[in-house]
Amino acid sequence: MKTRQARELGQRVAALVQAGQTDQAYALLAPTLAERTSFRMLGLVGEAVGAGPLETATTFLEHVAAAGSMGGWVVIGKALGEQLERDPGGVFVRCRAFIIAADVWYGTDILGERVPGPALVANLTPTLALLAPWREDANRWVRRSVGVAVHFWAKRSRGKAEHTAQAETLLAFVEPMFEEWEIDAVKGVGWGLKTLGRHYPDLVADWLAQQVVQRQRRHRKLTLRKALTFLSDEQRTRATG
């Protein structure tokens, strides 16, 4: 599928969604979801849907979620991302519900990289307030998505010095999750720390030293292993004592 085709499909699907014709909209989209369509093209469809009225878009996205296709989570994630400026609180409520509905790692990661991740990049402080309850959510996938969002922010930061203070804020934010024990959630937390360590290695080394050496906090070996991935030998020694 070419970009123009994806945009045209998105416009057609969005028009049906806005008209309240949910079944017809999904029938139009379903063949594309069944094919090997790139996430970028699916994202264009999602953006078109998300640009429309919230109520009809939500009804359609719930229909997409019920089908459970991998590509469907991309459409949902990009649609929610398109709604962030209009309804940030509502988007986070809906995103959490979709993460729980997905109940699988790739659905969680797709949504985490398209909703809370970009929200952190766009507006860090208000987003942290919305994301804070997810750190201790009863659902492991919701907790995992916090780490995915931090990974996305770190990737976009590219290690620029001007973002160092924000990186410090994010390390403080994920500190309560260092003792996460459920392995699916641990992988998300570790991913976030790994990418922060890639771009801000000294910062992460000092932070790990506080958790591991000074406070001797209980943690999964996987969490620490991922966090150490991009650190130098000297930084690893500093981090682990």
Predicted regions and their residues:
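Alpha-helical scaffold domains
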Residues: M1-G241
